[in-house]
A protein has these predicted regions:
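Noncatalytic, beta-rich nucleic-acid-contacting surfaces in large DNA/RNA-processing enzymes
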Residues: 1-452
Length: 452
């Protein structure tokens, strides 16, 4: 049901937009169905997918050109899909030995057209010199035998080995099973595997939200290096935060395991003063939300972290030099937190930009959230779907087709052209997918308005 509903994100071999559509159409129910999808969704056999789906959904429409084909093609609803089926056709209809039939399989897989075309006579009429009786001698009508061989010739252009397809389909099935029955664990592992690619992570985060899984912000007291599973959802991994390397994350986790979670921002600065934590990493941890657990505004922490880290480093040096007496140590321990300035919190837009710049993702929200009802009514196309359609040669989107897209402008660059007009290159991003647009317009004839 999951695959048939198009929820294929993260499923091996099945997550592209085009093959997701095939899954929705075919409604796969077994490994055999997945094997056929993997074998058919390629440039050659893709044209036969509609016939395959129609035959699967309407088995009463399936016809065989000779009864002998039913036992060979029933598993693929009357369609030739695999090289192994061709072997059986040569054996059962043409009377070939297994070795002779396998030789034809090799010729087909290597696309030896001359050999394949020359073999028609032997398949239909037989070849006594090689002990091949032929299809007619085995009770197949001459016209039907020639039509079957024509289909074999067509098949030679996209022949696929079933053993290979089954191997792919088995992994597809396993990953689909894990996603269906262990969604949090699977999606956490999946995002960890691509955490260096923010665009892929963004796509999987969108899939998590569609699945009803909550993405928990990075947390200095809970996050580990990888994405991890918690009762409330999936916790963002600290290693995905820019300028926070895995070595530093390991030091943070080791400190938590040794002495418990950090009770305050001051304590964090003190306890991590001898690690690889530098000011750039600290700033990024604050901006991505990893310090929200201390109950302070991000705007406040951004104003005090520099001095707090400097003070912590000085205290550590004095402690090593024996310059801190017992009274001052006790006083430091009794101070629960650094005094915070009375400033307003960052505006939502600035907060989301901070998350984007430090993780490559919008975490606590998306700038487009307020516009989604309007975008849905406007039938806005997904940039990711458009790019996938062109990459796979599908016809859902085509050159010169007019589509409506919406997103956040990530960058804009202008330059004059040779004819004196102005050209702009704009990088637009919707939910995690970026694309570049080139706009050209005449000087003095632009009517631009800024929207916020």
């Amino acid at each position: 049901a999951m695959l048939g509903q198009g929820r294929t994100a993260g499923v091996f071999q099945l997550e592209s937009a085009g093959i997701t559509g095939v899954c929705v159409g075919m409604q796969p129910q077994s490994i055999e169905d997945l094997t056929a999808i993997v074998a058919l969704y390629r440039p050659g056999p893709m044209d036969s997918i509609p016939k395959f789906i129609d035959s699967k959904l309407h088995p009463e429409k399936i016809t065989y050109k000779t009864p002998q084909l039913q036992s060979i093609l029933d598993v693929t609803y009357g369609c030739i899909v695999y090289q192994e089926q061709v072997i059986e056709i040569f054996r059962k209809l043409g009377g070939y030995t297994l070795g002779q039939a396998d030789n034809m399989r090799r010729a087909i897989s290597k696309k030896k057209q001359q050999v394949i075309v020359a073999e028609r006579k032997a398949f239909v009429y037989g070849d006594p010199d090689r002990g091949i009786p032929g299809a007619i001698a085995n009770g197949v009508d001459e016209q039907a035998a020639n039509v079957i061989y024509d289909e074999i010739l067509d098949f030679a252009n996209y022949a696929f080995n079933k053993a290979h397809a089954v191997c792919y389909a088995k992994v597809s099935y396993d990953t689909a099973y894990l996603k269906c029955h262990y969604p949090k664990q699977y999606m956490a592992a999946l995002m960890t595997s691509v955490q260096d690619n923010s665009m892929k992570v963004a796509g999987y985060i969108a899939a998590c939200r569609e699945m009803g899984l909550q993405l928990l912000l990075p947390d200095i007291n809970h996050s580990e290096s990888a994405f991890t599973v918690e009762p409330e959802g999936i916790r963002f991994g600290l290693a995905a935060v820019k300028n926070v390397g895995k070595g530093l994350v390991e030091q943070i986790v080791a400190e938590r395991q040794a002495d418990g979670p950090f009770a305050s921002f001051r304590q964090l600065c003190e306890r991590l003063s001898q690690t690889d934590l530098n000011k750039r990493a600290m700033e990024n941890l604050i901006r991505c939300g990893a310090m929200d657990c201390f109950g302070h505004k991000r705007a406040q922490l951004l104003l005090v972290y520099d001095q707090a880290m400097t003070d912590a480093a000085q205290n550590r040096r004095r402690n090593l030099e024996g310059q801190i007496d017992l009274f001052s140590m006790d006083q430091t321990e009794n101070e629960t937190e650094i005094p915070m300035p009375d400033v307003p919190e960052l505006p939502p837009q600035e907060r989301m930009v901070g998350e984007k710049e430090t993780t490559g993702l919008y975490l606590s929200g998306h700038p487009m959230d307020a516009y989604r009802p309007m975008l849905k009514n406007a039938h806005v196309a997904s940039i990711g779907d458009i790019m996938t359609s062109f990459a796979e040669g599908a016809d859902r989107y085509r050159d010169e087709q007019v589509v409506t897209v919406a997103g956040v402008i990530q960058s804009i660059r202008t330059r004059p052209t040779r004819n004196g007009s102005l050209m702009a290159y704009i990088v637009l991003e919707d939910d995690g997918t970026k694309t570049a647009y080139r706009l050209e317009f005449e000087r003095g004839k632009t009517n631009g308005k800024q929207y916020s």
